[in-house]
C-alpha cells in the first residue's frame, strides 16, 4: 500500500496540478472521456491558472503525494453558487491520477478539504458533477453527498454541452 500525504499546494506544484487536471479529467475509456472534450486551455495556460490559484488561495489547493510524487489535488473554498450562504463551502475540483484510484488518495483529499472548510466556518459543502461521471458520483455518494435533483442543468464545456448536478452534505 502506498503512503498518502496531503499538504497545501506550493507554487512548485502548479505543473503537477495542471498535468493531473488534464490527464485525470479525461482518462481514456471512461464515461467522462465520452462526454467531455479535452480542455480548451492548453497545458501552459492550465499551469498559469493553477499557479495563480495556488498563489492567491482561490480556491485553496491541497495535493496528495505518494512519497515525493504529486498524484492528486483538491480545490475548495466558499460556494460560488449565486445566493448561497457564507456557511456553504464547495469542492471546486478533485482529481487523482487513474493509476492511484482506489488507493485512498481521493479520500485523503476529501478529508483535507473537509478540514479546511470547517476551519473556514463552513457547515455544509456542495460539488457539481457531470451526470455521466459515474465514478465521481459513486465516490461522492460514498462520502455522504446527496444529489439535489432540482439542480440538474446543462452547461457548455469547450465545444459540447454537459449535464451536471449538484450534490450536498453537512460537514
Identify the meaning behind each predicted range.
Residues 97-99, 103, 131-132:
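Active-site acidic-Proline motif in GNAT/NAT acetyltransferases
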Residues 136:
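Helix-turn-helix
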Amino acid at each position: 500500500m502506498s503512503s498518502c500525504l496531503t499538504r497545501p499546494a506550493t507554487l512548485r506544484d502548479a505543473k503537477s496540478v495542471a498535468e493531473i487536471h488534464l490527464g485525470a479529467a479525461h482518462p481514456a475509456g471512461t464515461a467522462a472521456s465520452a462526454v467531455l472534450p479535452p480542455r480548451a486551455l492548453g497545458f501552459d495556460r492550465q499551469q498559469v491558472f493553477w499557479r495563480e490559484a495556488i498563489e492567491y488561495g482561490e480556491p485553496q489547493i491541497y495535493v496528495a503525494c505518494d512519497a515525493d510524487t504529486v498524484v492528486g489535488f483538491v480545490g475548495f473554498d466558499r460556494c460560488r453558487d449565486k445566493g448561497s450562504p457564507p456557511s456553504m463551502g464547495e469542492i471546486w475540483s478533485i482529481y487523482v491520477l487513474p493509476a492511484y484510484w482506489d488507493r485512498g488518495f481521493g479520500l485523503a483529499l476529501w478529508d483535507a478539504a473537509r478540514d479546511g472548510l470547517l476551519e473556514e466556518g463552513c457547515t455544509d459543502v456542495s460539488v457539481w458533477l457531470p451526470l455521466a461521471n459515474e465514478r465521481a458520483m459513486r465516490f461522492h455518494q460514498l462520502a455522504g453527498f446527496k444529489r439535489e435533483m432540482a439542480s440538474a442543468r446543462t452547461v457548455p464545456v469547450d465545444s459540447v454541452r454537459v449535464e451536471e448536478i449538484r450534490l450536498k452534505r453537512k460537514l
